[in-house]
């Protein structure tokens, strides 16, 4: 019984983030009232050989933002979220006996592309542009963001660019969470996984610690080293991909 629009997104490791952004666009222009966004990633020799050729895999542990970080560890799996318009939600609640509260709100999306400037090297200025656009799209100020769920794969160049982008985007750095020390880098599905992680943080009032990181290389960044109780309201999620494609989105507590 499913119909209407079907799309497969493949903009590298930003794919999940862009899929969420496209879903938001479809809802905003009233092309549909509900979107199922699925992120999937297979791991194995056939899917990882070309990735490995880039020389970005660690032979140690994943250490996001650590002074001794040496690369990423690929992982896979699947994650799924369902987005619906506020109008459709309210209409459905009037017709159904079972009531429920939305788990969270997708409030903003931003994107940028390095283009010909540096397609294979992360650039802080373009990552910052993606974050700022997501905050603006959510009709928020930078001070309204209380948590950043970072891309933070543990690569030397990638983490440095993101740390610089965060510093350039915020007058006061919010809490920064990096989960890939626990999950590995889920590649194409990472953005959807982040949406689930952000929702769980909002639901249960906590921020997970940065597993694998022992020596924060960026002391100006408010990196969450140990799991802590915290009640976030607006979480900015980053997904950046090889080829210079960047996606950021804001998950907010539904009020």
Features from the language model and the residues they span:
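Conserved catalytic cysteine-centered active-site region
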Residues: 1-22, 47-74, 157, 163-192
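Active-site-proximal alpha-helical scaffold in enzymes
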Residues: 4-39, 74-95, 185-207, 224, ...
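Beta-strand segments within the central parallel beta-sheet cores of soluble alpha/beta enzyme folds
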Residues: 6-10, 34-41, 100-109, 143-150, ...
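Conserved small-residue
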Residues: 16, 23, 51, 82, ...
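Stable alpha-helical structural segments in soluble proteins, enriched in small hydrophobic residues
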Residues: 19, 126, 130-138, 165, ...
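Active-site-adjacent elements of ketosynthase-type condensing enzymes
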Residues: 42-64, 111-129, 153-165, 189, ...
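Condensing-enzyme catalytic core mediating Claisen C-C bond formation in acyl metabolism
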Residues: 57, 61-140, 146-147
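Flexible, low-complexity linker/loop segments at domain and module junctions
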Residues: 138, 142-144, 221-255
């Amino acid at each position: 019984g499913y119909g209407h629009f079907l799309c497969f997104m493949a903009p590298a490791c930003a794919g999940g983030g862009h899929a969420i952004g496209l879903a938001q666009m479809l809802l905003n222009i009233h092309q549909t009232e509900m979107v199922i966004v699925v992120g999937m990633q297979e791991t194995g020799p056939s899917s990882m050989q070309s990735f490995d050729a880039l020389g970005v895999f660690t032979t140690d542990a994943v250490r996001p933002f650590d002074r001794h970080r040496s690369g990423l560890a690929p992982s896979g799996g699947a994650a799924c979220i369902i987005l619906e318009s506020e109008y459709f939600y309210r209409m459905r609640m009037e017709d159904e006996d079972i009531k429920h509260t939305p788990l969270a709100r997708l409030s903003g999306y931003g994107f940028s592309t390095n283009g010909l400037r540096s397609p294979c090297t992360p650039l802080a200025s373009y990552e910052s542009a993606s974050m700022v656009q997501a905050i603006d799209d959510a009709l928020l100020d930078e001070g309204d963001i209380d948590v950043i769920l970072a891309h933070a794969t543990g690569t030397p160049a990638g983490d440095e660019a993101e740390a610089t982008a965060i510093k350039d985007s915020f007058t006061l750095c919010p809490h920064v969470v990096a989960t890939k020390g626990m999950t590995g880098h889920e590649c194409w599905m990472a953005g959807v996984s982040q949406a689930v992680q952000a929702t769980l943080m909002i639901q249960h009032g906590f921020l997970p610690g940065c597993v694998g990181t022992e020596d924060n290389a960026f002391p100006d960044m408010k990196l969450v080293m140990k799991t802590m109780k915290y009640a976030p309201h607006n979480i900015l999620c980053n997904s950046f991909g090889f080829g210079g494609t960047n996606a950021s989105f804001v998950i907010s507590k539904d009020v």
